[in-house]
Amino acid sequence: MLDFVVIFTKGGVVLWHSNASGNSFASCINSLIRGVILEERNTEAKYYEEDHLAVQFKLDNELDLVYAAIFQKVIKLNYLDGFLADMQAAFKEKYGDIRLGDDYDFDREYRRVLSAAEEASAKQVKAPKTMRSYNESQKSKKTVASMIQDDKKPVEKRVNIQEAPPPSKSQPSSPPTGSPMDKIIMEKRRKLREKLTPTKKTSPSDSKSSKPEKAGKKPRVWDLGGNSKDAALLDRSRDSPDDVQYQNINSELVGTMQGVIRDLDVESEDEADNEDASSEGEAEEQVQSKKGKRGGLLSYFKGIVGAKTMSLADLQPALEKMRDHLISKNVASEIAAKLCDSVAASLDGKQMGTFDSIASQVKEALTESLVRILSPKRRIDIIRDALESKRNGRPYTIIFCGVNGVGKSTNLAKICFWLIENDFNVLIAACDTFRAGAVEQLRTHTRHLNALHPAAKHDGRNMVQLYEKGYGKDAAGIAMEAIKFAHDTRVDVVLVDTAGRMQDNEPLMRSLSKLIKVNNPDLVLFVGEALVGNEAVDQLVKFNQSLADYSSNENPHIIDGIVLTKFDTIDDKVGAAISMTYITGQPIVFVGTGQTYADLKAINVNAVVNSLMK
């Protein structure tokens, strides 16, 4: 039932393997190493799937070994965890720390461990189902606090109704003088006399004059409101022609964005303190107190200077602090938990140095993991790719997508300015046909960019053009026409602006998937805010899922890169960069850092990690 079992080092050297099917599983193992082990993803589950195959693996951090078993995904093998643990114990028992090159005779031990695991699994299946214990029941999971009655709850007021005792026969039946019954009788007689006494009737006019007149409801007048009478004063369409030129042009921006985008400038100061020594000491004392006192003076000195094997119990206090620290830096809670689980899996069973502390080991492992996550698997070089497309006689197309209000149009204009600075002429396709003012915003950017780079300096050719068809049209059709127009007029780059949409809006997500499928762009960039935390995970997962689900292509085009906006507003809370990159596995191409066209940077991995670890 196991197609392939292998033992290899984390460096990729195969020590021993058993191939029952005779097929090659090299690509599956390489994908496991690249996608899971090196990036420390899903190391807690110890499970990986590729096509019709599934891989169950176990890490040995003490010897830096990986034990992996490959089987068909449709088969469920419940004994694999125990089997891999027994195989690890058998391998360490036979060879220990000895390295024999490629000569590892482990076949007999493998068959023994496998047969024992299969027999134990078969017995477990045949065994009668036993009743679950009290500890496994739902009642045992109730906390003590939930069963304690709260005495501070407001006490309901109870009304006690008491029946009056019957009157005794010795008392007279008539009420005494001054009793409530006398008062009631006197009041009724007075009302009867008032009815019988004739009164002077007042005329209707007198009654009307005596009553004060009620004032009618006055209409509300808003302070900044307007009406049709103010339209003539506000109309500037006649004396302000469309070809108005900008009088105050910030010419200092021209020439500042030539070449490669500059890296993000984030303070990368050394951390003020590696970890609070007192808090670390308290955490370690708590762990030691749980383990109990043992050994006296010798064990005391061994704990100070001796090499120690780290366990999950030792790592837990430091990992909890690190998880809270990551969440405070705006990392999504789910991603922070996965990162800490990954660090725990990489350090469990590893030998500590003589004077190393657990906190320093955790911090070092987490820093390495963050650097790997932020380092791109592939480099997106827009200038190189745009020059390649220009040589092939076609425009280079970029589509911008994202939720509402994150700054898609603004950062599109920044990227457009950067491309103009590098001698590319650009066509902006206004495919946001939904939001009021979207086309006018792009038209304003187009005029401003042409004012910064006038046609007179570029052989009489406008460096930026706007292709728009108004509102309410099909965005995919407008983008197709814009790309065709760019091809006919030999425009170098087409930037497609799309409408902002929430990730749960199915009609708009179908429209975006159609736009990407029909036009087949060179690059799809997701524009997201650096302010978001948990929302970043939901946005990216659902955008990618929608682009894959609503496309009829066998290999749908999903998000290629990320533009992180409003990075200047978050100080050192840079966790959104980790969340977005971890979810998609795609690089952060641009970072928006301000309000001008020159406020566009490339991400600096080390600087971001240093800010995150402060």
Swiss-Prot record:
The gene name on file is SrpRalpha
Q: Where is the composition biased (Pro residues)?
A: 164-178
Q: What is known of its domains?
A: The NG domain, also named G domain, is a special guanosine triphosphatase (GTPase) domain, which forms a guanosine 5'-triphosphate (GTP)-dependent complex with a homologous NG domain in the signal recognition particle (SRP) complex subunit SRP54. The two NG domains undergo cooperative rearrangements upon their assembly, which culminate in the reciprocal activation of the GTPase activity of one another. GTPase induced rearrangement of SR drives SRP-mediated cotranslational protein translocation into the ER.
Residues noted as binding GTP in the record, renumbered to the chain: 402-409, 497-501, 565-568
* Cellular compartments per GO CC: endomembrane system; endoplasmic reticulum membrane; signal recognition particle receptor complex
Question: Can you tell me which residues the record assigns to a coiled coil?
Answer: none
Phosphotyrosine: which positions carry it?
246
Modified residue Phosphoserine is at which positions?
Answer: 237, 240, 268, 278-279
Instruction: Return the PROSITE patterns for the record.
Output: SRP54
Reading the lineage from the top rank, the first entry is Eukaryota
UniProt record similarity statement: Belongs to the GTP-binding SRP family.
Q: Where in the cell is it found?
A: Endoplasmic reticulum membrane
This protein is called Signal recognition particle receptor subunit alpha homolog
What are its GO biological-process terms?
A: axonogenesis; intracellular protein transport; protein targeting to ER; regulation of protein secretion; SRP-dependent cotranslational protein targeting to membrane
Task: State the annotated membrane topology for this chain.
Answer: Peripheral membrane protein
Bias regions of kind Basic and acidic residues — which residues?
A: 149-160, 232-241
Give a short account of what the protein does: Component of the SRP (signal recognition particle) receptor. Ensures, in conjunction with the signal recognition particle, the correct targeting of the nascent secretory proteins to the endoplasmic reticulum membrane system. Forms a guanosine 5'-triphosphate (GTP)-dependent complex with the SRP subunit Srp54. SRP receptor compaction and GTPase rearrangement drive SRP-mediated cotranslational protein translocation into the ER. May have a role in axonogenesis.
- Region of interest called Disordered, as start-end residue ranges on this chain: 119-244, 268-290
- Fill in the subunit field for this protein: Heterodimer of SrpRalpha and SrpRbeta.
Tissue spec. comment: In 8-9 hours embryos, expression is seen in a segmental pattern along embryonic ventral midline.
Chain spans, region NG domain:
396-613
Q: Which organism is it from?
A: Drosophila melanogaster
Q: Where is the composition biased (Acidic residues)?
A: 268-285
